[in-house]
Amino acid sequence: MSNAALGAAAASTPLFEVRGLRAAFDGKPVLEIDSLRIPEGGVTVLVGENGSGKTTLLRILNGLLEPAAGSVHFRGLPLAGEGRTAARARSVMVHQLPLLFRGTVGQNVGYGLRIRGVPREEIVDRVAGSLEAVGLPGFAPRRATALSGGEMQRVCLARALALAPEVLLLDEPTANVDPGSRSVVERVVRDRARAGGSVVMSTHAMETAYRLCDTLLRLEAGRVVEPEENILRGAVERTDEQFTRFRAGGALILCPARQGQFRVAVVPMDELILSRTPLDSSARNRLRGTVTAVEQTAGLLRVSIDCGVVLKALVTPSAAVEIGVAVGRDLVVTFKASAVRLY
């Protein structure tokens, strides 16, 4: 398929689409995903405990592991066929445990370029640029075996960046690294997304997930489960002795006072109370909005309310009837400042 055709497919289809996916090790199921769409562009973060299936899913998306059943499509092409070539040509996976060859940092970072026949002068430039991007300028002559764990992880990331992939697949890129390396990795991920690239990464560190994600996918025992928190992007307006005021879209949210330049506010869905009129409550956040969607989930209803920013609340069916929840209905959303966490 031509590059033009691939581009047209990418514009109308998700980056990855999974149907009926099953994977097992030693006869034990490790992935059971009936349907999953990973969007093109931005940062998709897979979260879950160790053993939840995050790494297995990434390896399947990269074509490194064949599922026992089901289908995976990359930009509309089956990964079992023509899509595998397209995916491998446009994506790079960085594994959790850094693997470097003997030799210099520059030789490691330039390895993928050399085997692709890239001219030496271009390799030198791209190696220098990718090392600069991960905060390791001038590291090219150093011995790879003399690096710290955080530096090794950053060199592996630089090796991937040198190939200029459209898609980065990162398995626990911030695990077991120093805070400085963690900040660099997070910056690289954000920069890739801002530049129009796609990043699919895994982590069990929720603070990292909240800071980076455009889409959050939670895995439990190999299954995708719905997130139960509102993840709101915005900025701090001001902080006084009692509260930090966080602006998300058209909503101003009060949080416990914290100093810092936070970009994300997280509010659990089950902390939101819906009512037709303002409640007599000590809760400091009271936002008026309009119901835009009502979905069933595990015996509850997930209600979306546009309050200048869309908030989702979990309510019981009986409470929904009592309140009169319906699409188009105006409601008041109430929650405590202490329910809000900033990242």
PLM regions with names:
Residues 47-49:
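The feature captures the beta-strand-to-loop junction immediately N-terminal to the Walker
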Residues 70-81, 87:
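Conserved ABC transporter NBD signature motif
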Residues 168-172:
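Catalytic Walker B motif of ABC-type/P-loop ATPase nucleotide-binding domains
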